[in-house]
């Protein structure tokens, strides 16, 4: 429902072409295939089809009494986890720039559902801070003087937020480098200047170590199934059909308290 709901809303508001709805099949068929796979494995475990499978099942049940790893084989919980959409068409894959670290140590990748973590500012949790109707940019930064890279990332994302006010908007959540945010920084493998772009259904659709406004605009255009022209000129963003729209004056973004 979340996957289809935000796409229908974007099309009805004129923020995306009808083609966005075609992505529902690609993304939900993947989830269905994953659920069928896990259900089949669970059924095979409950009713073994061979002597070897029965021996494995009985051994796991015996070990599960005393060992946690065996209990996870009995109840993996996989059917309660959101499906990763990694590799789907609406995502912007990583494209590290020269001199910038990659995301090799990150637990998340484009397509994965966002992870929660406590935040110092209201409402107190990362997922509760996300926009319920539009895209959200998570910007990891410190104080401007001590963290010029993170400060530039904030400026670039806020510029993109201003340009996107005419096309659905962009909420910006700044996550400062403080002890209360340590878990968020760790879960997102964040460094000063790291930016994650999240869809309305809370899936990661792009991420950067140092994003530009054009990066954010192009990634959102791709996530909305528009031709990702990005910025053709300063202050010019693609419209809902992927064509170049009229210049849009930069306006303040929607930002959470630092």
Residue ranges and their predicted role:
Residues 10-258:
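Helical substrate-recognition/capping region of FAD-dependent monooxygenase/halogenase enzymes
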Residues 2-8:
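Functional cores that coordinate and move charged inorganic groups
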